[in-house]
Amino acid sequence: FIERNENVVLIGPSGVGKTHLAMALGYKATQAGIKTRFITAADLLLTLTTAHLQNNLKAVMHRAIKAYRLLIIDEIGYLPMNREQANLFFQVIAALYEKGSLIVTSNLPFGQWDTTFAQDTTLTAALLDRLLHHAHIVPIAGESYRLKHQKQAGMIRSKGDAS
């Protein structure tokens, strides 16, 4: 997918292995000599917001985003963005559109992404249009491995267990 500037979008509830799979794909890309960066959406926004406030956005976009052939952005949708952050995030997606590849993870279905992007349906539609145009969408279902581990250890009860 990287050779064709395509994206991978991993969608599913918390704890089903989206981040693990994204990191494994990034590791394989790195082994193949592809310059790769992994960052959480929160850290990416902190980097971009700081650069914007310091009038250094163009340089940071080049150094932190465009310099990579594969950018992995983890946890889109866990924290809502204000309008400025949503605009900065859109700039990342637009900058890489057909010029690089993205792997993104999210716990939200696409129909709820506007709740993350400052309730801006127009920006969300434009962002999804670019992200999904050349994308492999991988829905992941299942029980959280973290909760499963806790249940196996007897630390929490399954639904329907007697008290």
Question: Which residues does each PLM region occupy?
Answer:
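Walker B motif beta-strand of ABC-family P-loop ATPases
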Residues: 70
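Conserved P-loop
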Residues: 1-66, 116
